[in-house]
């Protein structure tokens, strides 16, 4: 019988030849992308396929050995059946001989009994003859006994022959009984061998089922391998397309990098402008303090230098506190910026820029209001000399309130400046209250000339001239204009940064959408490859099962039926 699995080596060679281009494609993919999960899955499936092929080869070898042993056992069973048929024929012959010999023995016994009866009858006749001879004259006894003795001798001779025949028949019966016992033993051995053959046939059927299962698994693995090969080909195509897309998107990436570099440069410029703005604010605050504490007319010098110096010292202390807080906030922002991602940091910087732009607009509006108040003061400077001292002091209170409003607008641009403003308000309000009380005291002292002379003599000590006020006011106006221009430039730059950030966001979203599409396509390809592998494995299993069933021996079950009939 031909081996149905004799072409296993040819199939392995064909599979290896098919795997070579797939391995080259996998090496190319690994060169492009490093470790590939598809290649890992392919290697795992190839290892499983090799393991299953080894198991299939072992199962085929076991099947061949079992088939050879089954053939030998079938031959032994056939020989035993032939021997059993011969022994059965011999038994039948011996039984027929025994029956014939038994019949002959019965006949001999009957003849023996008849001879004994004849002997007894002859003896009785002899007795009668002797009795009759005594009475009457009879023929001689010897003449009568001679034929009878001859017959007796013949009968004894026949009896001896029959006894010899009976002994020979007994020996034959004993030998036949021994042969029957041996035949029964051989029949029992044949039955045991037949049961072993049945067990082996059952095992062979189980092994055939396992072989079919292994063949189905091999078909499934072949299908999966084909699907993986198709997936690899599709992935190579997608890799090529992605490379083309990457090459096409190189210009976009370069543009994004240019935008990022421009954003960094603009952030640096914004930081420098923030520093200059802080310096300008400090100088503007100083100028505002000087302007609030100085008057134009040299004859009507009101505010003493000591009070101005104290207010200046307080404001400088508050500004130093604000600077310290600003430095701490900048350090915290830097430490947080190092931990956060680039895009989040840029977005937060843009948001802070927008917030700063709104606060700057508020500050510029407050400064314009303060500039308008200063202009009105400069216009009404000629009338201030004619007013009395209590009106001048009330104007001092109004200038202090405008200074407080200006300090409010300046402190809102910094973090943590509310507490210093409250303290400054309290201090200024205290000074205003003092001024108002002084004005009320002046109203009361207008009646007496001596008190007015003493008051003017005390307040004219250590005062500042009004000419410095005009120069400081001009410098403040120029600084405000420069700050306004810087604010406008910062707003323009912030708008440009926002536009760049929006473009970066759109580009990142487009890249993410493309990546999601690629992932979905790869998942669909993997599903299709799995389905193709399953179909391939099922086809291979069906083909192998059909080839194995077609190559099986047709008269394989005939010895079983013959042995069963003999049993």
From Swiss-Prot:
**Localization annotation:** Cytoplasm, Cytoskeleton
Where, if anywhere, are coiled coils annotated? 38-341, 516-545
From the UniProt entry, list the residue stretches annotated as the region Disordered.
425-457, 534-567
Span list, region Required for targeting to microtubules: 220-440
Broad class of where this protein is predominantly found? cytoplasm
Q: Which family does it belong to?
A: Belongs to the MAP70 family.
User: What is this protein for, i.e. what is its function?
Assistant: Plant-specific protein that interact with microtubules.
Q: This protein is called what?
A: Microtubule-associated protein 70-1
């Amino acid at each position: 019988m031909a081996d149905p699995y004799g072409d296993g080596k040819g199939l392995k060679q064909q599979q290896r030849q098919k795997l070579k281009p797939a391995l080259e494609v996998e090496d190319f993919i690994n060169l492009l992308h490093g470790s590939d999960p598809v290649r890992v899955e392919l290697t795992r499936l190839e290892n499983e396929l090799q393991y299953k092929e080894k198991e299939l080869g072992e199962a085929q070898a076991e099947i061949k050995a079992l088939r050879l042993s089954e053939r030998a056992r079938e031959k032994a069973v056939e020989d035993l059946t032939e021997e059993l048929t011969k022994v059965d024929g011999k038994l039948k012959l011996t039984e027929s001989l025994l029956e014939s010999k038994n019949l002959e023995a019965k006949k001999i016994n009957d003849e023996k009994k008849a001879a004994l009866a004849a002997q007894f009858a002859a003896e009785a006749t002899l007795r009668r003859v002797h009795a009759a001879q005594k009475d009457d004259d009879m023929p001689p006894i010897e003449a009568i006994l001679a034929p009878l003795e001859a017959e007796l001798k013949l009968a004894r001779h026949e009896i001896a022959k029959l006894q010899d025949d009976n002994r020979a028949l007994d020996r034959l019966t004993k030998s036949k009984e021994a042969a029957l016992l041996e035949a029964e033993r051989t029949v029992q051995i044949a039955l045991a061998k037949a049961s072993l053959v049945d067990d082996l046939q059952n095992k062979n059927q189980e092994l055939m089922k396992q072989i079919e299962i292994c063949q189905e698994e091999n078909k499934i693995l072949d299908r999966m391998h084909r699907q993986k090969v198709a997936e690899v080909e599709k992935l190579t195509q997608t890799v090529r397309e992605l490379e083309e897309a990457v090459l096409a998107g190189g210009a976009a990436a370069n543009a994004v990098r240019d935008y990022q570099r421009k954003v960094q440069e603009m952030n640096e410029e914004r930081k420098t402008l923030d520093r200059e703005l802080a310096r300008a604010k400090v100088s503007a605050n100083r100028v505002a303090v000087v302007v609030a504490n100085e008057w134009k007319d040299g004859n009507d010098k009101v505010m003493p230098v000591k009070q101005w110096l104290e207010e200046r010292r307080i404001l400088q202390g508050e500004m130093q506190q604000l600077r310290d807080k600003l430095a701490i906030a900048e350090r915290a922002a830097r430490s947080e910026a190092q931990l956060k991602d680039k895009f989040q940091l840029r977005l937060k910087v843009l948001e802070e820029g927008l917030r700063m732009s709104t606060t700057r607009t508020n500050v510029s509006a407050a400064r314009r209001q303060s500039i308008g108040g200063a202009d009105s003061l400069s216009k009404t400077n000629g009338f201030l000399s004619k007013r009395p001292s209590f009106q001048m002091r009330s104007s001092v209170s109004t200038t202090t309130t405008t200074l407080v409003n200006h300090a409010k607008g300046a402190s809102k641009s910094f973090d943590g400046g509310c507490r210093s403003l409250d303290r400054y308000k309290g201090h200024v309000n205290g000074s205003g209250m003092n001024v108002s009380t002084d004005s009320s005291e002046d109203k009361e002292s207008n009646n007496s000339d001596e008190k007015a002379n003493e008051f003017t003599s005390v307040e004219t000590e250590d005062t500042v001239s009004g000419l410095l006020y005009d120069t400081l006011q001009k410098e403040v106006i120029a600084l405000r204009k420069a700050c306004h221009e810087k604010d406008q430039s910062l707003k323009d730059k912030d708008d440009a940064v926002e536009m760049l950030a929006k473009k970066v966001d759109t580009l990142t979203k487009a890249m993410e959408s493309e990546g999601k599409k690629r992932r979905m396509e790869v998942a669909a390809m993997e599903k299709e490859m799995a389905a193709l592998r399953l179909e391939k494995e099922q086809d291979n299993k069906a083909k192998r099962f059909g080839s194995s069933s077609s190559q099986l021996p047709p008269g394989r079950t005939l010895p079983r039926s013959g042995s069963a009939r003999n049993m």
